[in-house]
Amino acid sequence: MATHQPLTEHYHQGLRDGDILTQIRTHYPDGPTLHQLAPLDQLHIGGIAASKKLLSLLDPQTHKHVLDIGSGVGGLMRQGAALGFHITGLDITHRFNVLNQALTDLSLHSTNPPLRCVTGDACALPFPEHDFDAVLFQHSLMNMPEPAHVLAQCRRVLRPGGKLVMHEVVSGENIADLRFPVPWAATPEHSHLLTIAELTKLLETNGFQLSHCEDWSSTALEWRQRQRQKEQTPHTAVLSPQWIFGERFLKMGKNLLENLANNAIKVVEISARC
């Protein structure tokens, strides 16, 4: 198995855990709403609207127990819990899980059913067979150097007929022009992007039947252009990705926009069944 130290170091470098909680308590003494937390905890391309669209692929009655792999600081989890899903989040970065729980505790929106945060490796999921009705990935598979192992583990923990849904960044036609740093990697050796063809083949090889694959790239580019304009205004936001990534995010955000515009990366939504 690959070592995860470079990944945790990448996410630890700019993380201001204590300052984040102080900022929230100061500006939102009654507790933040999901939308107020979104600039901090919805770190993926598309923000809270993209999470809403992804969750719409699941039904809380049919897919009651959900595993969010690479859950980060929990924006997707809290949004899903508000819809009635029982969500377990798994992340390799323990400080993210601690912050995730603290944000949930502070949140104005009651998470009923409660959320569960687990520190662990997606290549060796610490759950029994057939434990979940659905598995979510949102901008997390690209951090995983052994995606075949990860998808095999997903197949193991999903019940028969369970669903896997993804909102992922994949390689574009001009992947050789990919500029770093980006939010998921500071250097090329820590970026593990697949092409759409590679990803769908891996799903099929691991026993999944593809339901749909939708290219979100044009919408993602428009969203990132709007975010870039906001980031260049003198107004200081209460919360932003810089509380997670530090000053590096200014360069990361610029590169992300250029990578989308240059077709170095694409953004896709995928759903599959086992």
Tell where the protein language model's regions lie, with residue ranges.
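A short glycine-rich, Lys/Arg-flanked "PGG" loop and its adjoining helix->strand segment in the class I
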Residues: 148-163
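Conserved alpha-helix/loop element of class I SAM-dependent methyltransferases that forms part
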Residues: 44-62
